[in-house]
């Protein structure tokens, strides 16, 4: 086992918060490992005056970090999963994720509480074509203007009156401790599906680095890792970029397995309900030999915990045509469900 880890990350305040959350998880399992943060300035950070779709897409937030990983200048990289393209460099892999935060978007406005309440021809600041497509679906009269920068700079632009409103991810607002209910209003999934992977912190490593793989196996939040598979499969099949309005959100239908131990959850994946029942029982008791108290009992119908429902959205390049689709699947076939949805929706958009 290694004694030190070099962790590559963007230099933004939110990226550093994400990195420290990963370090906290690593320290829980490997308290003696030294974690060195290696801040890296990316092309996406440097170019702030143009929409991402004009300069290469969200991959610009990863390019320099992934190159450092490939050059073995860092051992692992921390990303917001929403910034990770569906197709990655072959030697690299997302080997772990942290538990998903609430992935909803937030309507940020000083005077009004929803998109519907905005006055005629109001201006919303947003560079995301996904958000633009949903905004125009709700209120075709609204003007959507390019609005880039970190969370603080966008809120400052709003405060100075550059726009009437903006839309930001709840995750960022919460983690930066700037969510203010006086002017921040959550948007429900039924009105605006989140970006694929929104709310998830991802850890990327080299596939052949066994030491990092061992660490990732320990810190990986399995329920979230399985939950994002249909979303990521949808994204990968379409090879979508920042010019394509695309969204997806997955959730467990029958029960939330977030409190199951890793042992119990692995039995879900294997489909061994008898072993699952035993593992779940053990994970919810106090171990007499160690004195450790595990998670509180969770009422679960064993075998149903693996049912996932994913809502998908896909639009054409100008956002004038949008299609929606829902897939309900088992964990074992969730990736195939994402691909199936992509094929069906692509055909519908192209008609």
UniProtKB/Swiss-Prot annotation:
From the UniProt record, give the pathway where this protein acts: Porphyrin-containing compound metabolism; protoporphyrin-IX biosynthesis; coproporphyrinogen-III from 5-aminolevulinate: step 2/4
Please provide the record's keywords in A-Z order: Porphyrin biosynthesis, Transferase
- Top enzyme category: transferase
Q: Which residues carry this modification: S-(dipyrrolylmethanemethyl)cysteine?
A: 242
Q: Which GO terms describe its cellular component?
A: cytoplasm
Q: What is its EC number?
A: 2.5.1.61
> Which metal ions or organic cofactors does this protein require, according to UniProt?
dipyrromethane
> Per the record's keyword annotation, is Transferase included, yes or no?
yes
Per the record, the coiled-coil ranges are: none
Q: Boundaries of each RPE1 insert domain copy?
A: 257-306
Mind telling me which Pfam families this protein's record contains? Porphobil_deam, Porphobil_deamC
Task: State the family it belongs to.
Answer: Belongs to the HMBS family.
Oligomeric state and interaction partners are given as:
Monomer.
Write the protein's name. Answer: Porphobilinogen deaminase
Q: Which organism is it from?
A: Rickettsia conorii (strain ATCC VR-613 / Malish 7)
